[in-house]
Curated annotation (Swiss-Prot):
GO CC annotations on file: ESC/E(Z) complex; nucleus
Region (Disordered) residue spans: 1-219, 345-387
Bias (Basic residues) ranges: 370-385
Stored Gene3D superfamilies: Classic Zinc Finger
Tissue expression pattern: Expressed in brain, brown adipose tissue, white adipose tissue, heart, kidney, lung, skeletal muscle, small intestine and spleen. Expressed at low levels in liver.
Organism per entry: Mus musculus
Record's keyword terms, sorted: Acetylation, Chromatin regulator, DNA-binding, Metal-binding, Nucleus, Phosphoprotein, Repeat, Repressor, Transcription, Transcription regulation, Zinc, Zinc-finger
Protein name: Zinc finger protein AEBP2
Annotated localization: Nucleus
Length: 504
């Protein structure tokens, strides 16, 4: 019986706390015409009837499965959205009336807990509000503020946002026209504007957030992530191994490509020292070869070790000979290249001192440039061509006449085939020896070329003529034939002339 009486008392309190009907005037409007005590009694009676009807309609809907959203089908009216705050005197009278009622504040808190448990449970059915125009009830604070306050009491259900506050005179339910509704208590007043649909979400720490706030926070978080990635800073995902923005440092390795050698070094001087000490100095026997893979002189024997040492510098890329002039970072693979480079600094200094003269072109240290300068120097030494040519027709006739006379005397062209001189003999003397033989003294024409000779009388017929090659003539007497036979010429050209004109 005690439990039944307690339930009846809870139902009475629940009916008294239920919202007003749409047609009933607000408590602020009635307060001007009726005394506060009569107003409270009428409100209690109407609330009891509406609460009983709501419990009969909803039944066990409040105890359904948790996790859903309680939706109200009624749209809030502008009249009910405005909350009428009473004066401080009316609040005190309400508190006295509530204190004198059966059950007191404890029964009110139990009734509010029942409301929170019945409305906070998650159900798939839609809950129809009996008072579609009522969106909020009057609060006991008396400050008349509108809006939502953070819940100060524990939440009503596991999935519902309804909460009950001890000592509060009413609990309000905010209907948002099909969106999620959150009822807040704890002495605070709540109201929603006419056409606005506000949805709330739960933050990470359990506090409700509006949808607009949550979207802004998500977009700002994404922008922070993008800026972090673009700036190259490490994020927690990168620290966990999901990403990496650190660039690997570039490292150049110098590999030895000598046959059957796989050594690797960090710099070209180290590679050059390795080649010189292991592969070059290690060769014995007087024969030196390059066994570098892909070399154009691969395995070509050489007798010069210094050549192999200079050649290996092309493979190692080392340039040990650096310029001694301050401020110059040039380096060379050979000492000769360094020797040709150093004078260019001083030639530039000398040319800069002479400002009036144009800047001289820098001499190239290459062999091609040196050969070109040598050729130009030799060309200047040669005599300039004569402006007048004295080889005219008269000179040509004189040369032709001398050639004809020479041919008549020597018969080079007619009988000697162009390379031999034909001599004719005449008897200038005759003698008889003791043995009885007769000898003749022959004189050769042209004169003064061949000496006179004594021959037997029987040989006279054979020695009427004698053919002698120009190369076999005595040089001291051959010039008597013609000065041009043995003219002065370079030794190389003379030998070539003899080979071409006097083949043996």
């Amino acid at each position: 019986m005690a439990a039944a009486l307690a339930d009846m008392a809870d139902l009475e309190e629940l009916s008294r706390l239920s919202p007003l009907s749409p047609g009933s005037p607000g408590p602020a409007a009635r307060g001007r015409a009726e005394p506060p005590e009569e107003e409270e009694e009428e409100d209690d009676e109407e609330a009891e009837a509406e609460a009983v009807a709501a419990l009969l309609l909803n039944g066990g809907a409040g105890g359904g499965a948790g996790g859903g959203e309680a939706e109200t089908m009624s749209e809030p009216s502008p009249e009910s959205a405005s909350q009428a705050g009473g004066d401080e005197d009316e609040d005190e009278e309400d508190d006295e009336d509530e204190g004198s009622s059966s059950g007191g504040a404890e029964e009110e808190s139990s009734a509010e807990s029942l409301v929170g448990s019945s409305s906070g449970g998650c159900s798939g059915d839609e809950t129809r509000s009996l008072s579609p125009g009522a969106a909020s009830s009057s609060s006991g604070d008396g400050d008349g503020k509108e809006g939502l306050e953070e819940p100060k009491g524990p939440r009503g259900g596991p999935g519902g946002p309804g909460s009950s506050g001890g000592g509060s005179s009413s609990s309000s339910v905010v209907s948002s026209g099909g969106d999620e509704g959150y009822g807040t208590g704890g002495g605070g007043s709540s109201a929603t504007s006419g056409g606005r649909r506000g949805s709330l979400e739960m933050s990470s720490d359990g506090e409700p957030l509006s949808r607009m706030d949550s979207e802004d926070s998500i977009s700002s978080t994404l922008m922070d992530i993008d800026s972090t990635i673009s700036s190259g800073r490490s994020t927690p995902a990168m620290m966990n191994g999901q990403g990496s923005t650190t660039a690997s440092s570039k490292h150049i390795a110098y590999n030895c490509c000598w046959d059957q050698c796989q050594a690797c070094f960090n710099s070209s001087p180290d590679l050059a020292d390795h080649i010189r000490s292991i592969h070059v100095d290690g060769q014995r026997g007087g024969v030196f070869v390059c066994l570098w893979k892909g070399c154009k002189v691969y395995n070509t024997p050489s007798t010069s070790q210094s050549w192999l040492q200079r050649h290996m510098l092309t493979h190692s890329g080392d340039k040990p000979f650096k310029c001694v002039v301050g401020g110059c970072n040039a380096s060379f693979a050979s000492q000769g290249g360094l020797a040709r480079h150093v004078p260019t600094h001083f030639s530039q200094q000398n040319s800069s001192k002479v400002s009036s003269q144009p800047k001289a072109k820098e001499e190239s240290p290459s062999k091609a440039g040196m050969n070109k300068r040598r050729k130009l120097k030799n060309k200047r030494r040669r005599s300039l061509p004569r402006p007048h040519d004295f080889f005219d027709a008269q000179t040509l006739d004189a040369i032709r006449h001398r050639a004809i006379c020479f041919n008549l005397s020597a018969h080079i062209e007619s009988l000697g085939k162009g390379h031999s001189v034909v001599f004719h003999s005449t008897v200038i003397a005759k003698r008889k020896e003791e043995s009885g033989k007769i000898k003749l003294l022959l004189h050769w024409m042209p004169e003064d070329i061949l000496p006179d000779v004594w021959v037997n009388e029987s040989e006279r017929h054979q020695l009427k003529t004698k053919v002698v090659h120009l190369s076999k003539l005595p040089k001291d007497t051959a010039l008597l034939l013609d000065p041009n036979i043995y003219r002065t010429m370079p030794q190389k050209r003379l030998k070539r002339f003899d080979i071409l004109n006097f083949p043996r």
